[in-house]
Design a protein with these regions (language model features):
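N-terminal small/polar loop signature for handling phosphorylated ligands or for N-terminal nucleophile
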Residues: 26-78, 86
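Glycine-rich beta-strand-to-loop/alpha-helix junction loops that act as flexible
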Residues: 11-13, 68-76, 220-222
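An accessory alpha-helical subdomain
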Residues: 144-237
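Short beta->alpha linker loops
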Residues: 44-47, 97, 118, 181
């Protein structure tokens, strides 16, 4: 069974300037791994319409799923929806279903639903809304693209509603073996193991603990029995 693939497009000048720290990619990777979807690529781009459109077109064609974060708020630099609409040749406008959600939310807080906030009801035609239990303004899914907020708490809450609807693969398993040898000492043997167990992924990570040096070998895959065979081979390197 081939694992579904995914990419992530993280949008926002504030991330690339260092003003804001991204937490969404790490969270997405962890959640997708648990349901057998491989997050294969992630890109960080500025609030540049041409770049956003071209990346959406490319990544949505190459991967089973594309997740975006950022750029769907009420301000002038929240341009993701227009870019998504352009990428799929759809019209973006204020949708009555999205507007109703916002109206009820702001009425409940006795806050005016002004023109800026109404912008968050602009959704491409044919898109399916993603629930936002924290601040109401919805994300949406259009074809294989999930468009979500950049604020981590909201991104996470949106993802929880999206995940049950995704086509899942086999859960990716992971195990770690600690070898008290340097990477240079085991590199050739490890290379042969990678060839032998070509259905698995191997990672090599040096460590230093209280003056003792070594290498952590991380094995990832979906076949538990095969992983255990590989683990035995790796342990023989000690």
């Amino acid at each position: 069974m081939e694992q579904p693939s995914a990419a992530m497009l993280v949008i926002g000048d504030e991330l690339l300037s260092g003003r804001t720290h991204d937490a969404n990619m790490h969270y997405l990777a962890k959640e997708l791994t648990e349901i057998g979807i491989n997050l294969t690529e992630a890109r960080f781009i500025r609030d540049d319409p041409a770049a956003i459109v071209s990346n959406i077109i490319e990544l949505s064609k190459r991967f089973d799923y594309l997740f975006t974060s950022g750029g769907i708020g009420p301000t002038h630099d929240d341009i993701t929806t227009d870019c998504v609409a352009e990428a799929f040749e759809k019209k973006a406008s204020i949708r009555s279903d999205a507007l109703k959600i916002l109206q009820e939310y702001y009425d409940g807080k006795d806050i005016e639903l002004n023109e800026a906030r109404r912008r968050m009801a602009r959704i491409p035609e044919t898109a399916e809304l993603i629930d936002n239990p924290i601040s109401a303004a919805p994300g949406y899914v259009i074809e294989n693209v999930c468009v979500m907020a950049g604020v981590p708490k909201i991104f996470q809450s949106m993802l929880k509603t999206v995940i049950p609807k995704l086509e899942k693969g086999l859960p990716t398993l992971s195990l770690s073996v600690k070898i008290y040898k340097g990477e240079g000492d085991i590199a050739l043997d490890l290379e042969e193991m990678v060839k032998t167990f070509d259905q698995l992924n191997f990672g090599s990570y040096p460590f230093s603990e209280k003056g003792v040096h070594g290498t952590n070998i991380v094995i990832r895959g979906t076949d538990k029995k095969l992983m255990e065979e590989a683990e035995d081979k790796v342990r023989s390197l000690t």
